Amino acid sequence: MNRRFPVWAPQAAQVTLVVGQGRAELPLTRDENGWWALQQPWDGGPDLVDYGYLVDGKGPFADPRSLRQPRGVHELGREFDPARYAWGDDGWRGRDLTGAVIYELHVGTFTPEGTLDSAIRRLDHLVRLGVDAVELLPVNAFNGTHGWGYDGVLWYAVHEPYGGPEAYQRFVDACHARGLAVVQDVVYNHLGPSGNHLPDFGPYLGSGAANTWGDALNLDGPLSDEVRRYIIDNAVYWLRDMHADGLRLDAVHALRDARALHLLEELAARVDELAGELGRPLTLIAESDLNDPKLIRSRAAHGYGLDAQWDDDVHHAVHANVTGETVGYYADFGGLGALVKVFQRGWFHDGTWSSFRERHHGRPLDPDIPFRRLVAFAQDHDQVGNRAVGDRMSAQVGEGSLAAAAALVLLGPFTPMLFMGEEWGARTPWQFFTSHPEPELGEATARGRIAEFARMGWDPAVVPDPQDPATFARSHLDWSEPEREPHAGLLAFYTDLIALRRELPVDAPAREVDADEARGVFAFSRGPLRVTVALRPGPVGVPEHGGLVLAYGEVRAGAAGLHLDGPGAAIVRLE
């Protein structure tokens, strides 16, 4: 904790510290790199104090590196010393998260209370399920009380309604005590539209550089060295000071960086260095829609050296074949051939024509890159929440089809990820919700959602108002569901699938991948198992081999062998 209160404001003529209960105003001194600070540490006693800055008479604004915002992003921040927490995870050695089972959750809707402390009380459910890691949607501070978290404006501060930074430390500690790793979702491609005062301090945003969500960060323009340092230091903060085990990097395709050394490569090198310093593995997972192996190619082979990246193509192939939905970006994925290709080659679009994009897309995955470096899922926050009404797959198909999707993801060759509630077939939607204090911003957000859905062929009239508190309320999990059927049976199947997955060598490829389009049957072998998935009603033959290990759906023995009544899944052990 630095009580000289340094802040970067390279273009300011004057910066004044506003500090303490009496809001004393103390002038700061500038160094040659544009950093302002007190010449001597402030001696205001041991208590943590509120502080902010006047920049050329404007403000006061919160510190861009503020670690706590107890009264919101427009107010003064409060000192926070992460070293004061008495960690109990000295025995935690971390784990390689490629090949692990990841569970994605949103703090605000995971429990009725919507806090990190209340989430701790549900961690034992995840342990019984058998997952290896919890991935938290962004927890950085944003304007308003509730939202998805992707409009953060103070990236170092934990959103106060979730419990603030101390609650975050308690959550990570509780996860590690149960053998669960923690992946933190971070957003470095834009800043939120409300409460963003970073441009008042300096050129954090790129000139004329914008993406889907707003102004892009200044990664390659004048004075961009400190902007990049701001991002890399933030990653280090979550991993070192808050003990996270990995980061999910949001929409890296939206990063605008023309430097020879790309930010992602620089970040990966620093995180590798940090892993050596900490003596535990750290994982960087990119979200990217580029289907570009450069992200996860080694730096020695002129890649960025990230550990894994999301694979939307697996989702699209699973979703289209399980639900039969082929509108919008699902159009190319409607046949079982799409499933065959992603199981054999990792991506469907690897230089092929994309009808949704109306151009060729992607490039082939390097043959030496194992599929565990691709994160696959049947549902996630984007693919559920960005539907017109935020309906889960459970609103479109029955439990047998949900079980089929689960078998594809959890026993496939990828790193599997589940979305909270998926494991019991939650019937609660997960919708897009916001709490922008500015009415005009809320209205603009709603209009943007309606325009976005038009291209997918969904009825804009049914899109819920993101600003309506009922939209947020509907999106909370119902924890009574897994205690009753049919949810309890599906939960047991997920649990058994995850246990079965542990028998498989992590890099075992999918072999003998077969598909029968007419009958809606997809099958593959991995390790000692043969997986048969029936996507349509009716009996499907299942090879007996060494005997049935697990099934969802009735399996009958007859003269011709085993038959599974679809939809469902059956797994047998190979002789």
Curated annotation (Swiss-Prot):
Catalytic activity: hydrolysis of (1->4)-alpha-D-glucosidic linkage in 4-alpha-D-[(1->4)-alpha-D-glucanosyl]n trehalose to yield trehalose and (1->4)-alpha-D-glucan
Active site, UniProt feature: 250 (nucleophile), 287 (proton donor)
Pfam families, sorted: Alpha-amylase
Keyword Hydrolase in record: yes
Site (Transition state stabilizer): 382
Keywords, alphabetical: Carbohydrate metabolism, Cytoplasm, Glycosidase, Hydrolase
Highest rank taxon of the organism: Bacteria
Gene Ontology molecular functions: 4-alpha-D-(1->4)-alpha-D-glucanotrehalose trehalohydrolase activity
A Gene Ontology BP annotation from the UniProt entry: trehalose biosynthetic process
Broadest EC class assigned to this enzyme: hydrolase
EC number(s) stated in the UniProt entry for this protein: 3.2.1.141
GO cellular component: cytoplasm
Family matches, as PANTHER family: 1,4-ALPHA-GLUCAN-BRANCHING ENZYME (PTHR43651), MALTO-OLIGOSYLTREHALOSE TREHALOHYDROLASE (PTHR43651:SF11)
Protein name as annotated: Malto-oligosyltrehalose trehalohydrolase
Organism: Arthrobacter ramosus
Gene coding for it: treZ
